[in-house]
Amino acid sequence: MQPSQLRSLTTESRNPNTMGISQADPLEILQMINEEDMKVAQAVNLVLPHVKTASDFAYDSISNGGRLIYLGAGTSGRLGVMDAVECPPTYSVSPDVIVGIMAGGDSAFSHAAEDVEDSEEAGKQDLVHIHLTSKDTVVGIAASGRTPYIIGALNYAKSIGAKTVALSCNEQSKISELADCAIEVIVGPEAITGSTRMKAASAHKMILNMLSTSVMIRQGKVYENLMVDVKVSNHKLKERAITIIQHVTNASYEQALKTLEAADLEVKTAIVMLQTNTDKKTAKDLLNKANGHIDKAISHHQS
C-alpha cells in the first residue's frame, strides 16, 4: 500500500475533536478520550448482524469438532489471545477449542514484534503449524484491514475450506474481500491519530467477547445468566460456584457445598443432582444426553 493510500484509511485520519489534546489539562484530556470511547458501543451495534453470522460459523465449527481460531498482529493479536485464554477457566472448555495466535509467537505478547505482520507466509505457516482443517473457523483481526499476516492466513484458510471472518475498522478493506464474513466496525478517527489500540481495539475486544460468549451460551455453558461451567480452581471460584448452585436450586450453603464436592466440583452436575434428586452418575448421564444443557437434562429426567 502506498503512503497516500494508508493516510486515506479512517483509522489513520486526524480527529477534529481532539486537535487540541496536547494543550489540554489532564481532566480535559480524559474527557476528550472518554467522549470518543462512547462512540464505540454505537459502532458495534451497527455490525451485530455480521457478528451473528460469525457466531454461527464458530458455533457450527465447535459443535462438529472444529475450533474457533483468532489471528492478529500487535494489539489485534493480543486481543485474540486474551479472549481465547479466558474461555477455559470461565467455561471449562479445552484450550484447543478456542485458540489465539499472535504474529511473532507468545513472546510478542509482551515484547512488540511489529515486523512480522508484513509477512503473508507467516500467517499461513501459523495456521499450518496448528493443523488447520475445514472444520475450523478463522477470525483475522486487523484494525487497518490490510495486514499482510492476516491476508496470508485468510487466503490459506479459504484454500482448505475453513470458514473465514475478517474483523477490521475500515470500510471496503482488503481482508473483507477475502472472508466469508466481513465485520467492519467503523469507530472513526482515534483520539491520538493512528493509535488503534484505543477505539479500534475497544471495539474489537467487545466483538470478540460477544463472539466467544454467544457460542458458549449456545453450547449450554450458561444457565439463565450464570456461568455454570466455571472451572473451580481456587477458593474464590469455589465460593462463586456455591453461590451459583444456591441461585438455581435454593439449596443451603452447606447443601450446595456438599453436593458440589460430591459432583467433583462440576457446577452443572451439582445443579442437576439437586434439581432431580439423583446421584452424580445419573446427573452426568442426563447432561450428556442433553448435550450439556441443564434445562434439557432436567426435562429428560421429568419425562
Curated annotation (Swiss-Prot):
CDD domains, per database record: SIS_Etherase
EC number(s) from the headed UniProt entry: 4.2.1.126
Residues at the catalytic site: E86 (proton donor), E117
Pathway entry: Amino-sugar metabolism; N-acetylmuramate degradation
Reactions the enzyme catalyzes: N-acetyl-D-muramate 6-phosphate + H2O = N-acetyl-D-glucosamine 6-phosphate + (R)-lactate
Residue intervals of the SIS domain: 58-221
Keywords: Carbohydrate metabolism, Lyase
Signal peptide stretch: none
Gene3D superfamilies: 1.10.8.1080, Glucose-6-phosphate isomerase like protein, domain 1 (3.40.50.10490)
A biological process term (GO) from this entry: N-acetylmuramic acid catabolic process
Highest taxon of the lineage: Bacteria
Region (Disordered): 1-21
PROSITE patterns associated with the record: GCKR, SIS
Pfam families the UniProt entry points to: GKRP-like_C, GKRP_SIS_N
Main function: Specifically catalyzes the cleavage of the D-lactyl ether substituent of MurNAc 6-phosphate, producing GlcNAc 6-phosphate and D-lactate.
Further remark: A lyase-type mechanism (elimination/hydration) is suggested for the cleavage of the lactyl ether bond of MurNAc 6-phosphate, with the formation of an alpha,beta-unsaturated aldehyde intermediate with (E)-stereochemistry, followed by the syn addition of water to give product.
NCBIfam families in UniProt: N-acetylmuramic acid 6-phosphate etherase (TIGR00274), PRK05441.1 (NF003915), PRK12570.1 (NF009222)
Subunit structure: Homodimer.
Protein name per UniProt: N-acetylmuramic acid 6-phosphate etherase
Source organism of the structure: Bacillus pumilus (strain SAFR-032)
Name of the encoding gene: murQ
